[in-house]
Amino acid sequence: MPTRSPATRVPLDAPLGSRLHLFLLAAFSVCLQLLPLLNAEYGYFRDELYYMACAKRLAFGYVDHPPLAPFVLRLVLITLGGSVLAIRLLPALAGAATVFLTGSIARRLGGGTFAQSLAALAMAVAPGFLIFCGFYSMNPFESLLWTGCVYLVVRIVKEDEPHLWTLVGLLVGMGLLNKHTLIVYALSLGLALLLTPTRRHVLSRWFWLGGALAVLIVLPNVVWQVQNDLASLEFYRNANLLKNVDTSPVEVLLAQVFVMNPLAFPVWFAGLCFFLFSRQGRAFRILGLTYLFLLTTMMWAGSSRPDRMLAAYPMLFAGGGVLIAGFVERRSRWLLQGVIAGAVLVGGVLFAPIALPVLPPGMLVQYAEMLSPPRVEQGATARLPQWFADRTGWEEMAASIAEAQRLLPEREEGRVLLLAENYGEAGALEFFGPRYGLPPVLSPHNTYHLWSAEKDEAQTYIAIGLSEEELRGVFRDVTPVGVHRCTYCMDYENDLTIYVCRDARTPFRDWWPAMKWYGGARKS
C-alpha cells in the first residue's frame, strides 16, 4: 500500500486556527488593494462611474452587463457612500476571499501548509488579479464565485457529496447574473464532466436541481434581454469586432503567462500537470480539462483579453502548490520552499507597479514602457496603461463643461442638456455634475442610450466626444466653445472639442434612435 507524502496529511476538519496562514494571506491581499488608495493622483475608474449610474437605475439587465454588480453597488452606496475607498472595499474583500479559497482548495486536494500558502500567495500577487480587484467591476465577483464552484466540485469528487451540486448551481446562477461570460466556464466544466468518471453525477437528481436553480436565477436577465431586443448580444458582437485586438494562439498563451506573473508560471503549469498526469490529482482531472477547454476557446476566438480566464487560475495554483510541495518534501525542504515562494513574491513585487496605483503617473509611464504590458483593445493608446489612464481626467472634464456652460446666454438656462459620446464621459459628468452645477447628461452609448431616450427634448446641447461632422448631421447650429485636455488619460479622451449645439433638424424622438451605439468606448 503506497504511503502518502507529508504534504497530503491534512485533517479536513481542522479548526480555523490551523488555517491562520490563509487568513493572513487574505489580509495581505486586502492591504495590497487598499493601501495604494492613499495615492490621490488616481481617481475613479471609468467603469466605476458608469456602475454608480447603473446602481441609481436598478433593473434586471443592462446593455453591457447583467444586474448583480449594480445591485450590490447600490447597497454599498446606501451603507458606505460613494467614495473611492467605499466602492473599492468590496472588490478587495472579494479578492481576499478568493485568495483564501485558493488555499482551501489546495487543502482539499491534500496539500499541507506550504502547498496552501504557495497557492494563495501566487494568486494574491498575480498582476491581473491585482488589477481587477483594484476597482469596482464584475471581475472580482466572477473570480470569487467561480473559485467557490471549483471548491465545491473538489468536495463533490473527493467526498462524494452530490447534494453540493445545488450550491454549484446557485453560484453558477449568481455568476451568470454577474457576468455573462461565466457561461464559457460552465460549459467547459460540463464538457470536462462528460469526459471523466465524474460523469456519473449527470444521473444524480442533485445535478439537475443545481442546473434548474442556475436557470431560475438568471431568468430575469433573460427576460430583460428579450424585452430589449437582445441588447447584450449586439454589444458583444460589436465589442468583438471593433474593440478587442486579434491575437494569435501563441500571443494568447504569452498574455496568460504575463498577467498571472511570469515567475508564477511554474506553479500554475505544475497545477495543470497535477490534474492531468499525476496519480494524486487523477480524480480531479475534470479541473485540468476545464482549463484546457477554456484556453482552447480563448485561442480559437483570438481574444486579446487575458482577464477572461482570470478565474481559472485559483484551481491551477492550488494543484500546483500540492504537486510542488510533494516534490519539495523529498529534498532540501526549507531551502526550496524559500526559493520557490520567494520567486513568486519577487515576480509580484516586480509587476505590482503596473497593477496597483503605487507610482506617480510620470514614473509609471517609464516603468510601463520597460515592462510592456499586452495591448488589449483596438485604438486604446495612452502614456499610461489603460487601467490607470481611465482613472484620470474625469473631474477636469466636468470643470471644462462648466466653463462652456457659463458662456451660454441666461435665456437658455434650464433648457440645456449635456451630450457625451461614451459611458465614461457620461458617467463622469453625471457624478461630478452636481459639484459644478451641470445639467443632466445624455449619451448614445450602451445603457445610457436607453436611459437617455426617456429625456425631454432640450433647446441647447453641450456636446463632448462627438465629431463636428456627426453633430452637424443632427443640428443646424454647431459652435465650438472650448477644449478639454488631460495629461495622462486615454488619447481619445484628450483634446476633445466642446460644442454648443442648437436648432435640431428633426425632433429628438427621430434623431436619437439613429445615434445608438452598443460596443466599446469608441465606434472606431
Question: Where is each model-derived feature located?
Answer:
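Transmembrane-helix motifs of polytopic, lipid-linked glycan transferases
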Residues: 89-110, 148, 152
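Membrane-interface transmembrane helices that cradle and orient dolichyl/undecaprenyl
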Residues: 107, 149-165, 271-280
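Membrane-interface alpha helices of multi-pass inner-membrane proteins
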Residues: 57, 164-179, 214-215, 293-299
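Short hydrophobic alpha-helices at membrane interfaces in multi-pass membrane enzymes
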Residues: 152-173, 204, 208, 212, ...
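Short helix- or helix-capping micro-motifs
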Residues: 26-29, 119-127, 172, 176, ...
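Transmembrane-helix signature of polytopic, membrane-embedded enzymes
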Residues: 2, 20-27, 102-125, 144
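Short acidic/glycine- and proline-prone juxtamembrane loop motifs at membrane-interface regions
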Residues: 128, 134-142
